[in-house]
Structure formats: structure tokens, C-alpha cells
Amino acid sequence: MAPKITSELLRQLRQAMRNLEYVTEPIQAYIIPSGDAHQSEYIAPCDCRRAFVSGFDGSAGTAIVTEEHAAMWTDGRYFLQAAKQMDSNWTLMKMGLKDTPTQEDWLVSVLPEGSRVGVDPLIIPTDYWKKMAKVLRSAGHHLIPVKDNLVDKIWTDRPERPCKPLITLGLDYTGISWKDKVADLRLKMAERNVVWFVVTALDEIAWLFNLRGSDVEHNPVFFSYAILGLETIMLFIDGDRIDAPIVKEHLLLDLGLEAEYRIQVLPYKSILSELKILCASLSPREKVWVSDKASYAVSEAIPKDHRCCMPYTPICIAKAVKNSAESEGMRRAHIKDAVALCELFNWLEKEVPKGGVTEISAANKAEEFRRQQADFVDLSFPTISSTGPNGAIIHYAPVPETNRTLSLDEVYLIDSGAQYKDGTTDVTRTMHFGTPTAYEKECFTYVLKGHIAVSAAVFPTGTKGHLLDSFARSALWDSGLDYLHGTGHGVGSFLNVHEGPCGISYKTFSDEPLEAGMIVTDEPGYYEDGAFGIRIENVVLVVPVKTKYNFNNRGSLTFEPLTLVPIQTKMIDVDSLTDKECDWLNSYHLTCRDVIGKELQKQGRQEALEWLIRETQPISKQP
């Protein structure tokens, strides 16, 4: 993987930083975040500014360019990838390591006195702005909003913003109509004297209106904003896609609806001007809800006295708790996904010994089998298909320059998922097609122990995800090992594969308590640089569980695995498992055999069924 040569781009960007057509005064540093105007994790090609200017295209990272330096902050998932993709103009800042300075501290250390630091206010989150501005101000510097995005000014062949057709979802999939969702939100608004709710996150808008799109690859969302009032609904969206008959019928646009459910459709880019008009007529005590992750530009359009910022919006929290229709849809999606993976792993077992199966061809085969399933829409993220040392790159995606052939001598890791109309999947399995070494089995077994510890955990209602994170790491920690990513993230229902506010991690997104109906992943791992990667990932549903006692009547919760794909027993040091762990795995495999076996039989996939039966044989420790 040859790094991108960035010398000329950086020269042009630094020139733009001094160009008075774009800035009122020259700026001494420019911040280029990962996200778009909606702070999305996965973004459209037209918003890949950080990747364009640096070459690093991982989903998380922030670039900062000064007159003399170019630095990139990213987390442990991307250390190896970023190092390979960036040239010598860039300094990699490894977030989470004790010697790595924060972005603001680094700026203070390298900038001349009284510097101006610029950023596009439409793509910087409000919470980030506040933190950065405070530190810079205390050191005598200034954070400046730069209205014209400077990367756009030097990006001559920047792609157009997508504007693709919309998908409507009926009650069979959503369980609740968009009108009822609006009514529920208005009740919450009225309780708090909130008259307007500005919705900026793309998945929140899609969920609210029971619509999906395909403007961002693998994420069924569409570019839009929404403003919800107590008697008004405004949807900011471009193109004629809103005029499609099926969409007009779904949103009841042609019906003489009561005024409070009539949707006003406005141009996408008019959000700031319309918001300022609405705020101009607010009475003194009236409030406007907005996420603190909304862009600084949107937040600043609301007068400070009226602005009510929230870390998680009511939509974010409601969306995370799946209703029965959504939970059932997720179960159906995971059954179909397991069928596809049984087909894939059966195919790999036959083909890998012959030679010629590569990381890319294996990923393509996984997609081929998924496409055969009903209601398949797209993958849910680019498939991580990695063998040998590539497996140690946590978010590796194979490209022709790095494409390795699967062999009988290396560990193979595949992390993949799909968007079905009834649900979103995300599953990782690690396997060996020959004979794993004792060390590979040892590491795999530590990871499996952590996976089981989380999946089998029983915990009080109100427990936050970070309290479960150590369950996944305990066996690794006992041996002095660890991994540099969270243990689990929320998963959308035919929505983004990563969603808040719940998760299992030492990081801040796991601040919201887990509750019944939430769906998260359980994915501990271990990565040996230059050798292999191991990860075992299931999507799990939070469910109530009965316990012997019920302290303070608070109730208890546990997890139901939705992913039903065998875990390769060849990779396990069975004698290192406890009896409880053996029982858990045997029970899990029995469920895989019963549930997925029936579906394989129904679909006439006999070879894959035979593979499933072989892979779900009970394990037992040596007496």
C-alpha cells in the first residue's frame, strides 16, 4: 500500500490559509475532521476531505495542518493503516497512548503567539468546538469559523453530493408510524417548554420518518435536516425524490392532513437561514433542543438563551430501544445472514486448500451469498477480510496492493455484515484452515473466554456498558494481553451499523445504561502485529432475566445472541475453558444447529447444512 504523496496538496492548502478571498485574516492552523455536516461516522465521497488531503481513509481521525506541520490523530483501530497510507509529511498521533498530546495541547505547543486556528463550522461538532476554543483561548490563541471549506477550494474534482431515491418502511418493519413517533416527541418537548427540536443526525431523521436512503455507502440514510415544532414539521431535503408517489403516500403529502402533521419540504442548504428566522420569534422562556454533536454552525444559529444542548437526543435514545417488530426483524435478518455465512465457510473449507482464494475473492463470495437472501439491500460496512499479518490491522479492508492469498498456515479473520430490509448484521469469525499453533489457540481461547463472559453476564437494570468492558478483557489481562478498541457498539435496525448511545467500552459513548430492547455487539479481540488478528463478534439483544433474588425490585438483564454462526472449535484450547464456558458454547452451538439448520433445510442448502452439523459438535474437556 503506497502512501499518498501530499506535498503539493499541503502547499495549496497552506496557500488557501493565507488567501483573503477565503479568510478575513490569515490563519496559522486548519482543522480537518472526519465527519460531514451531520457528524456521520461513514461519509459520502464528497465529504472525504481528510482522506483527500492526507491519504488516510479510516473512519475515524482528525487532521491538523499548520504552516510547518501536518498531524493526524486516530485511535488504535487505525494505527497500522494510517502509518501505511500517509507519507512523510504527516506525523501520526496515536490517541489513547500516554505520550500522545491532545489536539489542543499540540496546537498550543507548536503555534506562534496569538495564532488563529480555522475550521469549517458546518462540519465541526459543537462539543468539540467548545473544548478546543477554551484551551486555545487560555493560551492566547483564537478558534475561527471559516465559512468556505478550504479543502473544497483545492479539491478540483470533488464528487457531487448524492441524492438517491428513498425507501419507505411500513409498520411490519417499524412497529410504529412516523406520526406516532412525532406525537411521542412532542409530548417530551411540551414537558420541558421546548418549542423546536432541530434534528441533524441522518439516522435519526431516517428513523423518525420511517424512511431509508442510500446517499452514504452501506448506511441507509439520506442527506437532510428536520425541525420539529409543536405544530409544525420541516424537512430539508434536495432533489425530486420526495415527489416519488410511494414517498408522497408514505408521508401523506397529498392528503389534507391536520396542520400539525403536514410536512413542509424545504431546500437542504436552507437549514441555517430558516432556523434563524424561527429563533427570531421565540419568547423569552421558550427553548430549542439540539444535540451537542450538531455542527457549531447549526448550534450558533440558535441564540444561547434559547439553546438546550443534549448529549443524546430523545430520538437517539428511543431509536436504541428496539420494539417487538424491530427485534423480530433483527432476528430474521441474522438467520438469513447465518445461512450466507454457513455457505461461505463451507466454500472456504473446500477451496482454500486448492490455493487461489484471496482476501478480496473471499469478501466477494460473502457478498454473493448474502445477495441470495430475501430483502438484502447492501453490505453494512466494507468487509474486513484479512489473513495472517493483515488481520492485525483492526479495520483492514483488502485492496489489490495488499491482497493476500488464504492458506493452510495462517489465521483468517472476516468481519462482515449486511443491511436487510428487516435488520442490520455485523459478525466476526476467526478461523484456521490448517493446524493452528499452540500460541494462536491460546490467544483465541482468551478472546473466546471474554466473549462468553460478556454474553453470559447477568447484571442489574441500569448498568452502564463500561462496567461490562472488563469482563471481555479479564482473561487477556491475566496473561498481560489486551486490545485497542471497544468491546461493543450499538447496532441500528436497518440503519447504521454503529449507533449510540449504548455500547460496551471504556469510552464515553457507553455512558447510557443498558436496557431491555437495546442491541449491541460483543467483540473482544487480540492482535499480534505482523502475525495475526483474532476477533469473535456477535450481535446481542438486551433481555430481562429472572434471578433467584431481586434486590430493591430493580430487575436484572442479560444478552440473547442474535448472531447464530458457529465458532470454530479447532481454534480452542478446550482444556483451558471452565465447565460453564464449555456448557455455554455447546448450548450456543445447539441453538445455531436448531435455528439455522431449519432455515438451511428450508432453502435446500444441503452442503452448508452438513458443514453446520460438523461445526456444532459438542466439545468436552479431557477427564
Curated annotation (Swiss-Prot):
Origin superkingdom: Eukaryota
Main location (coarse class): cytoplasm
UniProtKB keywords: Acetylation, Aminopeptidase, Cytoplasm, Hydrolase, Manganese, Metal-binding, Metalloprotease, Protease
Taxonomic lineage from the root: Eukaryota, Metazoa, Chordata, Craniata, Vertebrata
Gene encoding the protein: XPNPEP1
EC number: 3.4.11.9
Organism: Bos taurus
Protein's job: Metalloaminopeptidase that catalyzes the removal of a penultimate prolyl residue from the N-termini of peptides, such as Arg-Pro-Pro. Contributes to the degradation of bradykinin.
Cell location: Cytoplasm, Cytosol
Residues binding Mn(2+) 1: D415, D426, E537
PANTHER family: XAA-PRO AMINOPEPTIDASE 1
Reaction(s) catalysed (UniProt annotation): Release of any N-terminal amino acid, including proline, that is linked to proline, even from a dipeptide or tripeptide
Residue numbers binding Mn(2+) 2: D426, H489, E523, E537
Binding-site residues for a peptide, renumbered to this chain: R77, H395, H489, H498, E523
GO molecular function: manganese ion binding; metalloaminopeptidase activity
Protein family per UniProt: Belongs to the peptidase M24B family.
Record-given protein name: Xaa-Pro aminopeptidase 1
Cofactor note: Binds 2 manganese ions per subunit.
InterPro entries (alphabetical): Creatin/AminoP/Spt16_N, Creatinase/aminopeptidase-like, Creatinase_N, Pept_M24, Pept_M24B, Peptidase_M24_C, Peptidase_M24B_aminopep-P_CS, X-Pro_aminopeptidase_P
Modified residues (N6-acetyllysine): K304
